[in-house]
Amino acid sequence: SSSFLIINKVSGTIVDLLYSPISPGEATTAIILAAVTRGFLVAIVSLPIFYFLADIEIRNYYALIFYTFISSFILGAAGMIVGIIMSKFEGIAAVNGFLIVPLTMISGTFYTIDKLPEFLQLASKCNPFFFMISGFRYSFLEIEEFDGSIFVGVIYLTILAVGLWLGAYLLYKKGYKIKS
């Protein structure tokens, strides 16, 4: 989403999107759902490779579909916000390097959070990537990080997705850094 917007801003073709006969809500939703589509395409291509390389089994298809959708939606909405705010690709790289990658690394991807000190466990439970990773882990292993973590993750990530959509919508509707 961010690359799409930056490319259009830099090339000057963002006006085609701004003055198209669709509402800001429709444009926001379309841009984010394009990211969701890319997320599902990556999953569809990756799963056969995973099956070939490792002995994996999907134990909860509903969780896999939900977490693929919600994770792609959140990252697409966040990407749209970054694409609206930033004016160059360096800004996207900075957000990726200083926010996305560190949050991913401290999300419990490579370890379970019960190995961490208590205060870091609490901090991990505020990290949306923790709930995304936990949801995917549950899809394949049906293991929860803590009792009710899947339910908490569904609620937390849904609220975050709605909030990010709203933020992207408001920035796009206002034309922040794209109507100048």
Where are these regions (language model features)?
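Alpha-helical transmembrane segments and their short interhelical loops
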Residues: 24-96, 146-169
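Membrane-interfacial helix-loop-helix junctions in multi-pass membrane proteins
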Residues: 54, 107-162
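Short cytosolic juxtamembrane segments of multi-pass membrane proteins
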Residues: 172-180
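Residue-level signature of catalytic and energy-coupling elements of molecular machines
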Residues: 21, 82, 106
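Transmembrane helix boundary and interhelical loop/hinge segments in multi-pass membrane proteins
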Residues: 1-22
